[in-house]
Amino acid sequence: MFQPAGHGQDWAMEGPRDGLKKERLVDDRHDSGLDSMKDEEYEQMVKELREIRLQPQEAPLAAEPWKQQLTEDGDSFLHLAIIHEEKPLTMEVIGQVKGDLAFLNFQNNLQQTPLHLAVITNQPGIAEALLKAGCDPELRDFRGNTPLHLACEQGCLASVAVLTQTCTPQHLHSVLQATNYNGHTCLHLASIHGYLAIVEHLVTLGADVNAQEPCNGRTALHLAVDLQNPDLVSLLLKCGADVNRVTYQGYSPYQLTWGRPSTRIQQQLGQLTLENLQMLPESEDEESYDTESEFTEDELPYDDCVFGGQRLTL
């Protein structure tokens, strides 16, 4: 499996999160499919494809044998062409299978479609071709991420632009509302990783700036406070974030500033927050808040890339 490349974050903290991160990196070491097919077998598939020049009326699409071949990871020939970044070959395959939605949207063992892999490998041109050929941008991988979730997580503005401009308005509306299996929308992921341009772009497209995580009710503004990102706080306020929206435990973004180092964030929110949502309950102390801000795996940044079970240093 391909994993998004790491993006070092200033907000990374030591402590319990380190243990979570190590466990997550171990769990995420999946085979990418690169080593599951021998070079000779891959070259033979390439040769067979290049020899195919039949018109649709001469043979149905399903009759082409290379479409039926899968690796042990469930990768199709199109998956492999994208993984290996064989762009001319990938475009040729897409051209031949245009309209064959079952093949274009086929998901490997990790539930990744060719569109997911185009985003992971940072090939926005391929992603655009796949969308125009009929790929479904709403399909999710094994973590519940759509391709747009991955693009926001990686901070690839070019892929975000392709995915939001090429899909239909109906698809776009659904994807912007969709949450992955950690309860995060695309806006949440862009906020967590501090990609301000993507945050602003998503809100402009109609993303709900006050969307709450299903598990604890944090909004993007709560996340910005948790991650101590004053620039993100400013942007979210500019985009209409509700400073008085509380989590399911009743905490406003301002209340999360207690015990945090950024006085700038506290000043920003203090001017706008209702008085009764500024002080912590008398029965609470600053340490009791720790249960509110447990980090999910989405908030632990990728810092490695795994190919065939081997970690690469970027």
Curated annotation (Swiss-Prot):
PROSITE patterns xref list: ANK_REP_REGION, ANK_REPEAT
Location of the motif Destruction motif: 30-36
Phosphoserine modifications at: S32, S36, S283, S288, S293
Keywords for this protein: ANK repeat, Cytoplasm, Hydroxylation, Isopeptide bond, Nucleus, Phosphoprotein, Repeat, Ubl conjugation
Crosslink site: Glycyl lysine isopeptide (Lys-Gly) (interchain with G-Cter in SUMO): K21
InterPro entries reported for this sequence: Ankyrin_rpt, Ankyrin_rpt-contain_sf, NF-kappa-B_inhibitor
Phosphothreonine: residues bearing it: T291, T296
Region annotation (Disordered) ranges: 1-40
Top-rank taxon, per record: Eukaryota
Biased composition, class Basic and acidic residues, residue ranges: 15-40
Extent of motif Nuclear export signal: 45-54
Repeat (ANK) residue spans along the chain: 73-103, 110-139, 143-172, 182-211, 216-245
Motif Nuclear import signal per UniProt: ranges: 110-120
Positions of post-translational (3S)-3-hydroxyasparagine modification: N210, N244
Keyword Nucleus recorded: yes
Annotated GO MF terms: identical protein binding; NF-kappaB binding; nuclear localization sequence binding; protein sequestering activity; transcription regulator inhibitor activity; ubiquitin protein ligase binding
GO CC terms in record: cytoplasm; cytosol; I-kappaB/NF-kappaB complex; nucleus; plasma membrane
Cross-link annotation Glycyl lysine isopeptide (Lys-Gly) (interchain with G-Cter in ubiquitin), location: K21, K22
Subunit structure: Interacts with RELA; the interaction requires the nuclear import signal. Part of a 70-90 kDa complex at least consisting of CHUK, IKBKB, NFKBIA, RELA, ELP1 and MAP3K14. Interacts with NKIRAS1 and NKIRAS2. Interacts with RWDD3; the interaction enhances sumoylation. Interacts with PRMT2. Interacts with PRKACA in platelets; this interaction is disrupted by thrombin and collagen. Interacts with MEFV. Interacts with DDRGK1; positively regulates NFKBIA phosphorylation and degradation.
Family under the similarity heading: Belongs to the NF-kappa-B inhibitor family.
General function of this protein: Inhibits the activity of dimeric NF-kappa-B/REL complexes by trapping REL (RELA/p65 and NFKB1/p50) dimers in the cytoplasm by masking their nuclear localization signals. On cellular stimulation by immune and pro-inflammatory responses, becomes phosphorylated promoting ubiquitination and degradation, enabling the dimeric RELA to translocate to the nucleus and activate transcription.
UniProt name for this protein: NF-kappa-B inhibitor alpha
Species for this entry: Mus musculus
